A protein has these predicted regions:
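Non-catalytic substrate/cofactor recognition surfaces at enzyme active-site rims
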Residues: 1-549, 553-560, 567-571
Length: 572
């Protein structure tokens, strides 16, 4: 077998075929070849990649350069494979699976629908890092291959050649293991983006990959015996019914990418009388006995495929790569199709597809993989859920951070708040029994640990809006005090100045407080109500943390509960 990973945005089927045709005479059949891309956005485009992106926008000279570069890339890939064949040595293969955390789900949702690119804290991810290594007779690592599910776009699109974080990962791995050749492929990360951007961050991301590889290879790995058993097939992925000619003729009157797509669709209608409603899709599998199944999927595959395959197969023996052997475009899941947006809809234009996929596409891909890997790799009885499909909670780091802050030298005011919190914690009870009807809004935002969670809030600029809740049944202490604890935040600092907020207890105004990102304390004029805020997560604009509300001689209702509300005072 042979695997080639190219620093490029994507390798279309035509390029894979041209390379495969050259290698047949050297004993490598097309089925035994995998050609993958790192998906860096900083590489020259290949002929056949995302045809609509450059259609009508290239000069004859640029077309010539693209063709020349494509041939150059194929020449270099062929040369690399032939050198590897010539220099074959007996090696011991081993593999391990680690975890790296810089990939975040980029699909921001609003009421369950795609709202743009960003960071969705609760979205699925794949933080697994499978690693394959080859050691020589002396135990020295001579080859490395790592795989991570994340867009290779930390640097972003720049008009200069660069490998982005995958390139830095390769460089770092080869530094850590002198004399080794490394490969970095990409998993099902079509809707996963790197958290953080810029050249230095890309280097940091690459270093994170290499550090985990180094750690894994210093621990117990699983040896692999013999060459892999190779299998593969082409399946047809269903699209929704293509639009009729009249639709494309109307689109032709426009401009831009939709105009170019219409030209391509009308050309197909003129040539064959129809537009295909299926996409030809290759799936390949390498199996090392019962120890490891390596799955290779074409295109930009969303993370749900990894989540599902790791649930329905034995994830402890599974490796899933995407961007392999062809680039038909994004491969969305049922979830992504239901949410809509870029990966489900507009991206299809770039790849010269007539429309979105039918939701049956997910079952088609998953069933093909399960057929090829076979029953040996089915989910085990009582199998635990793969641990790398959700972002780790920030709670542990939060309390470590608070401990460090408490031990540091802080302002006198902050130290007073800290001392007050220490006094209140032993007797504090939960503040929220049930939420009451109000005009508060719902959103997903960062909580006290920096985790993205469902929250209700009122806007500091929306005068009169009120957030209401009722406490659980309460018991006063011997001094007639009740201390309630809840989590939340206080406003957005760069917003125009407002009057702040009013805290209401039992319908009556108790005290006023204002936007802050620092530890703070507010006391009512009659000293019967005290509100203390301890931020445990902060950004440049807002914060999240713990509130402690102390009430003196307050009268609960007939059920032993207290009605509490916060009202926005709006602009001054």
């Amino acid at each position: 077998v042979a695997v080639v990973v190219l620093d490029n945005c994507g390798v279309p089927a035509g390029v894979t075929r041209r390379l495969a045709q050259r290698l047949v005479k050297h004993g490598i059949t097309p089925r035994h070849l995998v050609v993958a891309a790192t998906h860096t956005h900083n590489a020259p485009s290949l002929v056949g990649y995302a045809k609509v992106v450059w259609a009508g926008r290239m000069s004859p000279a640029q077309k010539k350069r693209m063709a020349e570069y494509t041939t150059f890339a194929i020449d270099r890939m062929e040369s690399a494979v032939l050198r590897a064949l010539k220099n074959r040595q007996l090696m011991q293969l081993e593999w391990a699976q680690g975890r790296v955390g810089f990939g975040g789900n980029r699909r921001v949702l609003n009421n369950g629908k795609w709202a743009g690119f960003g960071f969705q804290r609760n979205g699925p991810v794949d933080h697994s890092l499978p690693v394959l290594a080859a050691r020589d007779a002396d135990g020295k690592v001579r080859a490395l291959w790592a795989n991570y599910a994340c867009h290779c776009t930390t640097v972003g699109s720049r008009n200069r050649v660069g490998g982005d974080w995958a390139g830095f990962a390769n460089s770092s791995m080869e530094t850590d293991f002198p004399g080794a050749v490394s490969l970095m492929s990409i998993g099902c990360g079509a809707d996963i983006g790197p958290v953080g951007s810029g050249l230095q961050i890309a280097e940091k991301h690459g270093r994170a990959i290499a550090s985990e590889v180094k750690r894994l290879l210093a621990t117990k790995t699983t040896p692999l015996t013999g060459p892999p058993a190779v299998s593969g097939k082409h399946i047809q992925l269903p699209l929704i019914k293509p639009q009729p000619r009249v639709h494309w003729e109307a689109q032709l009157r426009g401009s831009g990418w939709h105009h170019q797509l219409a030209k391509a669709m009308l050309a197909k209608l003129d040539a064959t009388g129809s537009i295909p409603a299926q996409v030809n899709y290759p799936v390949s599998v390498w199996k090392f006995g019962d120890d490891l199944a390596m799955v290779f999927l074409a295109g930009e595959v969303v993370v749900d495929y990894s989540v599902r395959l790791n649930r329905e197969l034995d994830w402890t023996r599974l490796w899933i790569s995407a961007w392999a052997n062809d680039m038909p475009g994004y491969i969305p899941s049922r979830r992504v199709l239901a949410e809509g947006g870029y990966e489900a809809d507009f991206s299809q234009v770039y790849y010269e597809q007539p429309g979105r996929y039918d939701p049956k596409v997910e079952d088609a891909v998953v069933n093909a993989v399960k057929e090829l890997v076979g029953r040996t790799f089915e989910m085990l009885p009582g199998q635990k859920t793969a641990p790398f499909h959700t972002l780790p909670s920030g709670e542990a780091d939060t309390f470590n951070r608070v401990a460090k802050w408490a031990a540091a030298k802080n302002s006198e005011e902050e130290m007073m708040v800290l001392q007050k919190v220490r006094q209140l914690i032993p007797n504090a009870v939960p503040a929220i029994g049930r939420m009451l009807p109000s005009d508060a809004e719902q959103t997903e935002w960062f909580n006290f640990a920096g985790d993205h969670v469902r929250r209700v809030f009122i806007r500091q600029k929306a005068k009169g809006t009120t957030l209401r809740w009722q406490s659980p049944k309460l018991v006063k202490n011997a001094k007639g005090l009740i201390t309630l604890c809840f989590t939340g935040g206080v406003g957005w600092e760069s917003a125009p100045k407002t009057g702040g907020f009013t805290l209401l207890i039992g319908g009556g105004e108790a005290l006023q407080f204002d936007v802050t990102r620092k530890a703070n304390r507010w006391v009512s004029k009659d000293i019967k109500t005290e509100l203390v805020y301890l931020p445990t997560w902060t950004s440049l604009e807002d914060s999240g943390g713990f509130f402690f509300l102390t009430l003196t001689n307050v009268r609960p209702d007939a059920n032993g509960a207290i009605s509490i509300a916060v009202r926005s005072l709006g602009p001054d």
